[in-house]
A protein has these predicted regions:
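Hydrophobic core
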Residues: 38-45
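Secondary-structure end/capping motifs
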Residues: 258-342
Length: 370
C-alpha cells in the first residue's frame, strides 16, 4: 500500500508563532462579546419592537364605528399593532368628552378625542390626577361647521344673526360657536337643544334655521333624511376664522410615564395603517364593517373620504405635517377655548400636548399631494 507523505506538524491557526492571538481568535472573541450584549439587551427589553415585551393598550374612539374609525381598525385587523408588540383593544365611544374622562380615570390608556374637549377637561379639573395629553394630531382642522338649507335665505355666516340654531348641548360646534360668532360678526342667536339623532331631522323639517355639527356627519345624515346636498349651505369653522385643531390621539399621564416605548410603537403602527386608509378608503371600510356588520358601506366610505379631504389632508395639515401641532396655534386655541367655554381656569396650552412620542418624519409622510 502507498504510504502517506510525512507532513511537518502545524501550529494551531488561532496562535501566531510569537504566542499572540490570531485574527480568527480575535474575531471569535468579538462575536462572543456582541452576543453577550445582545442577550443582555433582550433581557432588559431593549432593541427592536420585536424584542420588546408585549404591552396591553385599551383604546376608545370618540364615536361609533363609522368611516373614520377605519384609521384605527385597519392597523388592528392587519396586525400592525401586534407586530409592534401591542395587544390593542378598540372600543366605540359616545363623544369626545366621555373619551377624555375615561382616559383620565384609567378605564382606557389611549383614546381619540377633540382637542377642545381635552382643553376643557384640563381647565375645569386643574387638580385632577392623570390628565390626558395629546400625542398625535389626526384631524388638523376641526370638522365643526354650521349648516342650513338654502331655502332659508342664509347665504353667509352673518345671515345667521337673529336665527334659531340647534345642536346637542355638548356638541363641539355649539360649544365653540362664540369663537365663530365673533369672527363673523353674528348677533342675537337663539339655541334649541336636542338629542343627536334629532338634529338633522329638525333642520330638515324647519324646526330650526341652522345646526352645528361635524360636517362629514351632519351632511350625510341630512342626505339620509331626504335632503339633497345641493340644497344645503355649509360654513366650515376652519374656513371662517376658527383655526381650531380637531381630533388627536390622547394618552393618560400614567400610561405615558409607565409605557413611553409602547406609545411610540402605537403611533408608528397607527401611521402605517393610516397611510393605507388614506390611499384606499374604499378597501379600508371593510374593516369597519367587520366590527359593525350593519353599517352602510357606501355611506361610510363617503364619510371617510369627506373626513380625509376636509380635516386630515387639509391645507393646514400639509403645511404643518401630519401628526404635528404648532405652539402658536395651540396657544391661540387655548385662549379662545378658555373664553368660549367659560372654563374654571385658563387652558395651559403647554400641558395638553407632547410631540416627543411622534415617529420620524419619513413615517409621518403619509399625506398624498393634491
Amino acid at each position: 500500500s502507498r504510504l502517506r507523505r510525512a507532513v511537518p506538524p502545524q501550529k494551531p491557526a488561532s496562535v501566531l508563532t510569537n504566542g499572540t492571538p490570531s485574527a480568527l481568535q480575535l474575531s471569535r472573541r468579538r462575536g462572543l462579546h456582541a452576543f453577550a450584549i445582545a442577550a443582555l439587551s433582550s433581557t432588559l427589553g431593549m432593541g427592536s419592537p420585536a424584542m420588546a415585551q408585549e404591552a396591553k393598550v385599551r383604546f376608545q374612539l370618540d364615536w361609533r364605528f363609522e368611516g373614520p374609525s377605519a384609521l384605527f381598525l385597519l392597523p388592528a385587523a392587519k396586525g400592525y399593532f401586534k407586530a409592534a408588540q401591542l395587544d390593542v383593544t378598540i372600543d366605540a365611544g359616545n363623544g369626545s368628552g366621555g373619551t377624555v374622562t375615561r382616559v383620565a380615570s384609567g378605564t382606557y390608556d389611549l383614546g381619540f378625542a377633540d382637542m377642545a374637549a381635552l382643553m376643557e377637561f384640563h381647565a375645569n379639573n386643574p387638580d385632577a390626577p392623570n390628565k390626558p395629553v395629546a400625542v398625535m394630531m389626526v384631524y388638523n382642522n376641526t370638522p365643526a361647521a354650521v349648516m342650513a338649507l338654502k331655502k332659508s335665505g342664509i347665504k353667509s355666516p352673518k345671515d345667521l344673526s337673529g336665527k334659531k340654531l340647534g345642536a346637542p348641548v355638548f356638541d363641539a360646534g355649539r360649544k365653540a360657536f362664540p369663537v365663530f360668532q365673533k369672527a363673523n360678526a353674528i348677533s342675537n342667536v337663539q339655541w334649541t337643544a336636542m338629542d343627536p339623532p334629532l338634529r338633522e331631522t329638525m333642520l330638515a323639517r324647519g324646526d330650526v334655521d341652522a345646526i352645528t355639527g361635524f360636517s362629514f356627519t351632519s351632511l350625510l345624515n341630512l342626505e339620509a333624511r331626504g335632503v339633497k346636498l345641493d340644497d344645503v349651505v355649509s360654513f366650515p369653522y376652519a374656513e371662517h376664522g376658527v383655526k381650531f385643531y380637531g381630533n388627536a390621539i390622547i394618552a393618560s399621564e400614567k400610561f405615558l410615564k409607565e409605557n413611553p416605548a409602547a406609545v411610540k410603537r402605537f403611533l408608528e403602527a397607527f401611521s402605517k395603517g393610516a397611510r393605507e386608509v388614506i390611499a384606499n378608503p374604499a378597501a379600508a371600510i371593510e374593516h369597519v364593517k367587520a366590527r359593525d356588520g350593519i353599517i352602510n358601506v357606501a355611506l361610510e366610505t363617503r364619510r371617510l373620504k369627506l373626513a380625509i379631504d376636509s380635516v386630515i389632508n387639509s391645507t393646514d395639515a400639509r403645511s404643518e405635517g401630519f401628526g404635528q401641532a404648532q405652539a402658536p396655534r395651540l396657544a391661540l386655541m387655548a385662549s379662545q377655548v378658555s373664553d368660549a367655554f367659560n372654563t374654571k381656569t385658563r387652558v395651559n396650552a403647554s400641558a395638553i400636548w407632547s410631540g416627543q412620542f411622534l415617529p420620524d418624519a419619513k413615517t409621518l409622510d403619509i399625506l398624498p399631494k393634491r
